[in-house]
Curated annotation (Swiss-Prot):
This is Melanocyte-stimulating hormone receptor. Residues 64-72, 141-163, 212-240, 301-317 are cytoplasmic. GO terms for molecular function: melanocyte-stimulating hormone receptor activity; ubiquitin protein ligase binding. It is found in: Cell membrane. The chain crosses the membrane at residues 38-63, 73-93, 119-140, 164-183, 192-211, 241-266, 280-300. PANTHER family: G-PROTEIN COUPLED RECEPTOR. Residues 1-37, 94-118, 184-191, 267-279 are extracellular. InterPro entries: GPCR_Rhodpsn (IPR000276), GPCR_Rhodpsn_7TM (IPR017452), Melcrt_ACTH_rcpt (IPR001671), MSH_rcpt (IPR000761). Receptor for MSH (alpha, beta) and ACTH. Does not seem to be active with gamma-MSH. The activity of this receptor is mediated by G proteins which activate adenylate cyclase. Mediates melanogenesis, the production of eumelanin (black/brown) and phaeomelanin (red/yellow), via regulation of cAMP signaling in melanocytes. Gene3D superfamilies: Rhodopsin 7-helix transmembrane proteins (1.20.1070.10). Belongs to the G-protein coupled receptor 1 family. GO terms for cellular component: cytoplasm; plasma membrane. CDD domains: 7tmA_MC1R (cd15351).
Length: 317
């Protein structure tokens, strides 16, 4: 990915120089005990990508099979699974092609590899943007279902959900094309960082508000049953733990990648930033880990979806 890492992995496999260079030069890699570089083996990249691929394919298949899951909420979850699937496919494809090039099994011209690298970059960038947007859409959908329960089906209709889904995919494609075309502009990187911060803030505000409402509801039930402390405290701890896991996974998996983008703009030549640039592959691996965890958080917790998933695994179509 041209502006994201300190190297283009596919082009680096051919030992050729990219045709375009950044207007800001990244700091040279710094060595020494204070500069930690975490090496990610290609086998681990492939393994994580394949696990994520299988998980998200199962989610899409289960939602497609069960008509009871054909609702806006599950359509958003399905689109999130497709986005995570594309993240995995693009990284697996890039790693596989890179290994074939390095082994001399695949022989092709540098121009062809450059075009392939651009296609993979479009997939990676587009799937990342769509994944962030669908995480935000799921948060908004759940917020409406709690705070506007009686009006939910009139607010979140299927036609409206389809329009939102179409808008997210179109915006993701356009964003990825703009990124590939203008990757040497700092504004593009700042826009991607801004999207991450906006989604993080949106999810934090909505889920914290939902947790507060749930705790308030639990207190009301506890008063009626005259067992206020045990019920309220247990529910509050469980809700806080769920919220911590949800937002914590999002921040830990996506945060380092967007920190990397921010530092490319803020301190591209600083030695300390150069240490962080060396761990770009680690940041990509964390995003793939997020694609593995997303189905566990958003999809597999549904009893209906788990039941359908068992039928899919048993091939009972």
């Amino acid at each position: 990915m041209p502006a994201l890492g300190s190297q283009r992995r596919l082009l680096g496999s051919l030992n050729c120089t990219p045709p375009a260079t950044l207007p800001f030069t990244l700091a040279p890699n710094r060595t020494g005990p204070q500069c930690l570089e975490v090496s990610i083996p290609d086998g681990l990249f492939l393994s994580l990508g394949l696990v994520s691929l299988v998980e998200n394919v199962l989610v899409v298949a289960a939602i497609a099979k069960n008509r009871n899951l054909h609702s806006p909420m599950y359509y958003f979850i399905c689109c999130l699974a497709v986005s995570d699937l594309l993240v995995s496919v693009s990284n697996v494809l890039e790693t596989a092609v890179m290994l074939l090039l390095e082994a001399g099994v695949l022989a092709t011209q540098a121009a062809v590899v450059q075009q392939l690298d651009n296609v993979i970059d479009v997939l990676i960038c587009g799937s990342m943007v769509s994944s962030l947007c669908f995480l935000g859409a799921i948060a908004v959908d759940r917020y409406i279902s709690i705070f506007y329960a009686l009006r939910y089906h009139s607010v979140v209709t299927l036609p409206r959900a389809w329009r939102i889904i179409a808008a997210i995919w179109v915006a993701s494609i356009l964003t990825s094309l703009l990124f590939i075309t203008y990757y040497n502009h700092k504004v593009i990187l700042l826009c991607l960082v801004g999207l991450f911060i906006a989604m993080l803030a949106l999810m934090a505000v909505l889920y914290v508000h939902m947790l507060a409402r749930a705790c308030q509801h639990a207190r009301g039930i506890a008063r009626l049953q005259k067992r206020q402390r045990p019920i309220h405290q247990g529910f509050g701890l469980k809700g806080a733990a769920t919220l911590t896991i949800l937002l914590g996974v999002f921040f830990l998996c996506w945060g380092p990648f967007f920190l990397h983008l921010s530092l490319i703009v803020l301190c591209p030549q600083h030695p300390t930033c150069g240490c962080i640039f060396k761990n770009f592959n680690l940041f990509l691996a964390l995003i793939i880990c997020n694609a593995i965890v997303d189905p566990l958080i958003y999809a597999f917790r549904s009893q209906e979806l788990r039941k359908t998933l068992q039928e899919v695994l048993q091939c009972s179509w």
